[in-house]
Amino acid sequence: KKNIKEAIDLLEKNKKDLDFLLLLIKIYYSIGETEKGAAVLKEAIEKNINHPRFNTSLSLRLLFKGDFENGFKLYENRSSKNKNYFKDIKEWNGENLRNKSIIVYNEQGLGDAIQFSKYLIPLSKIAQNIKFFVQDSIFDLFDNKINNLKISSKKSIDNNVADFKITLGSLIKFFYNKKINTNELSIKVEEKNKNYFKKIVNKNKLNVGLVWSGFIYGSGQPYRSIQLEKFKKILNLDANFFCLQNEVWEDDLPFFKKSKLKNYGHLNLKDITALIENLDLIVTVDTLFLHLASSLNKETWALLCIDPDWRWGELNKF
């Protein structure tokens, strides 16, 4: 607490500097001091700071609270959107797509590609020629049998011609409030894989998939991880528990080795997806598995920090 107070004091004295200002706001929200964070943010807004990084930070706050109209406008300032893909293709801003082609590409993380790919479904109702580019590592997760939609990996991203382009993150603003038929999932599960794990999973007990930590050097750490031993009481329940993550931190290894967790973290994502389909519940911190399990309409309990990502805010009411 002393170190946090010293950091806040230093940042408060130097908040005229954008880096200090953004970090100060982030710290206030991260430690649950939301009123102080909001006050600093309001003060900055009144100064009419017009910088892409500040606008992006503000957009995340607005989106979390549900101010989608203003939030998505400012969200266009995010640095990930400004990668120079398809520079000669016009950006789509809601124009009529009849007899037109459009490229959608994921410019953010794997979880975003999985979670937000559902917005390709309503797009496919108004466009007859959609090409969706995703990271190579998750290409096989997507269903290539959806009408008007072709899934492509990023390794084939060069020399593609279309009438329009849009990032997946920007596509959300057009369809976030549309009801999407959950039977038209963009994520596929191969039946033979699903049946294989059906034979392995003992249905005489509750079957729970558990993810308690992410990549140790990943974004948002350590706020996206929980010490495994804190699940001790839960793991003593009369249920089957499956480890889905492929990395166990060194501090967790002693408890992990003596726990009754069944380790399936070595599986590839296609197999993990099939396993999840056979489980009753997924309990996970904010990692790829939260996006994946919820996108499969599996009952999913999210273990979130005090100041979670905007994706887990008001957007989830739609």
Predicted regions and their residues:
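Alpha-helical solenoid repeat scaffolds of the TPR/TPR-like class and their adjacent stem/linker regions
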Residues: 1-281, 286-318
